[in-house]
Regions:
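Membrane-embedded alpha-helical bundles that constitute the cytochrome b-like, heme-associated redox core
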Residues: 1-150
Length: 150
């Protein structure tokens, strides 16, 4: 079960990154090109949010039911080890903040002028995307050295 959930979690990461970059680029293009906020812009944010929702569910299942890491049972010990601390505290905290930002951004883009909606999307989706880039255990980081790209 752990391996299957971990693979799904990893694949969803790539979908989140693609949807996030797409939503950010659409909002940036809308601002610079002074374009109307269209249904396609709304759908870009919607898919970004949906992939985040799925990722949160899989992540929670991994964290509470399937993960072999025991940091949650020994927080004092987990805080002393940077890798266990990352997976026990930092990864989840940043993920939840990014999740909330995407949901707030999606809700706020439903009202306002086209320019305001694009700016709101860029702000909330952009910050969430930066957090995702920071919370992923990339293979070039110590926390992801054994993970690989997928």
């Amino acid at each position: 079960m752990y391996d299957t959930l971990k693979i799904i979690h990893s694949l969803l990461r790539w979908l989140i990154l693609l949807a996030g970059f797409y939503a950010v680029l659409r909002s940036l293009g809308g601002i610079t090109g002074k374009k109307a906020y269209t249904g396609a812009d709304g759908k870009a944010g919607l898919f970004y949010m949906i992939f985040f929702d799925l990722q949160l569910l899989v992540g929670l299942a991994l964290y509470f039911f399937a993960s072999p890491l025991v940091g949650i049972h020994d927080m004092a010990g987990a805080m002393k080890d940077p890798i266990i601390r990352f997976y026990t505290v930092e990864h989840e905290t940043l993920a939840i903040i990014a999740f909330v930002l995407v949901h707030i951004g999606r809700a706020k883009t439903k009202k306002g002028t086209d320019a305001q909606r694009h700016k709101t999307a860029l702000l909330f989706f952009g910050i969430a995307l930066l957090l995702v880039l920071a919370l992923v255990p990339w293979p070039f980081r110590a926390v992801g050295a054994m993970q690989g790209w997928f």
